Amino acid sequence: MSQDVLTLAQDLIARASVTPLDEGCQPLMAKRLAAKGFNIEPMVFEDTTNMWARRGDQGPLFCFAGHTDVVPVGDLNRWHTPPFEPVVIDGYLHGRGAADMKGSLAAMVVATERFVDKHPDHKGSIAFLITSDEEGPFINGTTRVIDTLEARNEKITWSLVGEPSSTHKLGDIVKNGRRGSLTGNLTVKGVQGHVAYPHLADNPIHKAAPALDELARMKWDNGNEFFPPTSFQIANINGGTGASNVIPGSLEVMFNFRYSTEVTAEILIQRVLNILDAHGLDYDISWIFNGLPFLTDAGPLLDATREAIYEITGTETDPQTSGGTSDGRFIAPTGAQVIELGPVNATIHKVNECVKVEDIEQLAKVYERILEKLLC
């Protein structure tokens, strides 16, 4: 078995790129891509390092997308091995970012090297959109690169995001879409006072409770064949001074929608406002638009991905839209077809994160086969 993917994955993991740091990961990738004819364009926005690398100037444009940043390691005492000293144990590569997503990055680079060596005159173009701001606030990462590309009319046809999509074995699941995400920050106003004199106060918790109950019980839509019904979840509630004898003067509630293509953010916002107003609440509310829902249905990218997975691994893949958000949400609105395909996600963001070495080698072969199907 070739050790190319393993070696590069280890080199990437050894760089402690806790978000928003890159710690030299992108230059490492860039050096190898430049040797294969890629034009390397670093894009640094404030604290975030991004890279746009492209080989070719014609369409269609296939883009590998991913991130070099990783989440913090947590309690070091719970790690069996140092998180930034990658080691292989019983066939698994251990280290922070092994599964999310430095194993995928290594597979992308090696797959591209192999493809270009075999098909130097391939049709279209290949690109890499890499950021160090996926695990963080996602302000200066992929979204800023996409803005730059849009401004110069550089259009991505197909994008493969290397997020760890697999559940039990490599390729059993690919993400061909994601739900939208909308966060609300609600402040319900009241009048602070002594609990013994409620007539002199106005308890915002009591006032808000019926409205919150209605929001929690509301059926927002029925979903569809690609998306489950929209979900409303209260994430945080804060009210009171900590004392048992004080009626609070305000209540703060943070909630989130994960919504399907059956509704829009604007529809959800209006329905929330209607409920709050119907309960006569005095409130302030602000909204954070985390991402629109997107879906890549049957077409060249999804078809090539399903075929490649089966041909390399023998697995019949299941396209799904479940899970959290990814940077695919910033790429899809440009009109690109977007799918996510990466290794098993069982240990992502956990202590002792690891990935099966055989899986990232197989992943490189799948990525290469996808390139062959689309650009040969």
UniProtKB/Swiss-Prot annotation:
It catalyses: N-succinyl-(2S,6S)-2,6-diaminopimelate + H2O = (2S,6S)-2,6-diaminopimelate + succinate. Pathway: Amino-acid biosynthesis; L-lysine biosynthesis via DAP pathway; LL-2,6-diaminopimelate from (S)-tetrahydrodipicolinate (succinylase route): step 3/3. GO terms for molecular function: acetylornithine deacetylase activity; cobalt ion binding; succinyl-diaminopimelate desuccinylase activity; zinc ion binding. The keyword Metal-binding applies. InterPro entries: ArgE/DapE_CS, Bact_exopeptidase_dim_dom, DapE_proteobac, Peptidase_M20, Peptidase_M20_dimer, Peptidase_M20A. CDD domains: M20_DapE_proteobac. One of its GO terms (biological process) is L-arginine biosynthetic process. Zn(2+) 1 binds at residues 67, 100, 163. Its cofactor is Zn(2+); Co(2+). Pfam families: M20_dimer, Peptidase_M20. Zn(2+) 2 binds at residues 100, 135, 349. The active site is at residues 69, 134. Binds 2 Zn(2+) or Co(2+) ions per subunit. Keywords: Amino-acid biosynthesis, Cobalt, Diaminopimelate biosynthesis, Hydrolase, Lysine biosynthesis, Metal-binding, Zinc. SUPFAM superfamilies: Bacterial exopeptidase dimerisation domain, Zn-dependent exopeptidases. Its EC number is 3.5.1.18. Belongs to the peptidase M20A family. DapE subfamily. Catalyzes the hydrolysis of N-succinyl-L,L-diaminopimelic acid (SDAP), forming succinate and LL-2,6-diaminopimelate (DAP), an intermediate involved in the bacterial biosynthesis of lysine and meso-diaminopimelic acid, an essential component of bacterial cell walls. Homodimer. This is Succinyl-diaminopimelate desuccinylase 1. The gene is dapE1.
